[in-house]
């Protein structure tokens, strides 16, 4: 087992089922319907919200423990979620996805990979803490606008202690 998988398994072993992202619930109407990719989707709360609202969702996470719990949660909720165990550095998808979501996770080095997977006219939703955890995992208020500069900003705001960004890829 690789070190990242072991670290995330340990985190999820101790975690109760989290609540869905409040900003995602608030702003999901601004996202493009169709196929959605939930990057580092963890226990599946974001995927379930999107699936129950009509998206065809694929969740990807490195943790075998998380993907097992996400599958079970989707089954309990009767949410149509395809769950894939994979490393975000080597996403096994061709795309395109009309929506890509990344909540409570940041990996700046995969921005180009996500842009390639995002469909023309598709939306990217990012939510990440500004403070409270290691600086490596926090973002600056407008960092997503810079990181995804090729996207047309639909929303770039701060909700409490979190930066929230929605960007649309040109059609």
Annotated model-derived regions:
Residues 77-88:
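Conserved SAM-binding strand-loop segment of SAM-dependent methyltransferases
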Residues 70-71:
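Conserved SAM-binding loop
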Residues 1-31:
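S-adenosyl-L-methionine
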Residues 63-65:
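Conserved SAM/SAH-binding beta-strand->alpha-helix loop
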Residues 111-123:
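A short glycine-rich, Lys/Arg-flanked "PGG" loop and its adjoining helix->strand segment in the class I
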Residues 34-42:
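Conserved class I S-adenosyl-L-methionine
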Residues 121-131:
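Conserved beta-strand signature within the Rossmann-like core of class I S-adenosyl-L-methionine
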Residues 92-99:
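A short acidic, Gly/Pro-enriched loop at the edge of an enzyme's catalytic core
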């Amino acid at each position: 087992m690789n070190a990242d998988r072991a670290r995330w398994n340990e985190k999820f072993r101790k975690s109760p089922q989290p609540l869905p992202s409040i900003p995602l619930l608030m702003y999901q109407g601004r996202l493009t319907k169709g196929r959605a990719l939930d990057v580092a989707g963890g226990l599946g709360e974001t995927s379930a919200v999107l699936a129950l609202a009509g998206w065809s969702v694929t969740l990807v996470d490195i943790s075998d423990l998380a993907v097992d719990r996400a599958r079970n949660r989707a089954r309990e909720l009767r949410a149509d979620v395809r769950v894939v165990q994979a490393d975000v550095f080597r996403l096994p998808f061709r795309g395109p996805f009309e929506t890509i979501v990344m909540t409570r996770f940041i990996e700046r080095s995969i921005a180009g990979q996500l842009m390639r997977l995002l469909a023309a006219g598709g939306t990217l939703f990012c939510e990440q803490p500004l403070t409270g955890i290691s600086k490596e995992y926090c973002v600056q208020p407008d960092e997503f606008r810079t990181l995804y500069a090729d996207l047309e900003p639909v929303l770039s705001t701060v909700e409490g202690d979190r930066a929230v960004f929605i960007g649309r890829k040109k059609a």
